[in-house]
Regions:
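Mid-chain, well-packed structural core segment of small domains
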Residues: 80-108
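Vicinal oxygen chelate
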Residues: 2-59, 66-79, 101-144
Length: 144
């Protein structure tokens, strides 16, 4: 049985120029969501997620989509998740995006209506997520 294609094999070799978006954006239609950065230092307004051995901050308040993560020594998460930054992307079909990838955190639901998984791609941690249900997009400047 043939192995399923990886992102590297789907995207092929490429050389991106300064003005071009990454190939997962231009070729696959993925959309940037946030970047997660592990830290050893306590941060303001941390939320403790006991099941993950994790203190998280910044996700809902950073204008740039930066999430800070401080892990406990006994965190059950994959070592790469605890030590490497990740970039999270929205996708239209999580199952299709995960096909053939090295999944290091199985699809789960970080919040209502969202599914997310973490994968290793060429040694880098990436998060892919989709929305089970999406509400209407509200332009808050126009709403008020």
């Amino acid at each position: 049985m043939a192995s399923k294609p990886t992102l590297s094999s789907i995207l092929g070799s490429f050389h991106r120029r300064d003005h071009e978006p990454p190939p997962v954006v231009s070729k696959l239609g993925w959309r940037y969501h946030h970047v997660g950065i592990p830290t050893d230092s306590p941060r303001p307004n941390e939320t403790h997620l006991e099941a993950f051995g994790l203190h998280v901050s910044g996700f809902s308040t950073s204008p740039f989509g930066i999430e800070w993560m401080r892990y406990s020594d006994d965190s059950p998460l994959h070592p790469a998740i605890k030590t490497m930054p990740h970039v999270a992307f929205e996708v239209d079909d999580l199952d299709a995006a995960l096909e053939g990838q090295e999944i290091i955190y199985s699809p789960g639901s970080p919040s209502e209506g969202v599914r997310a998984a973490m994968i290793l791609v060429d040694g880098d941690v990436e998060v892919v997520r989709d929305y089970v249900r999406r509400g209407p997009i509200i332009d808050y400047d126009q709403a008020w």
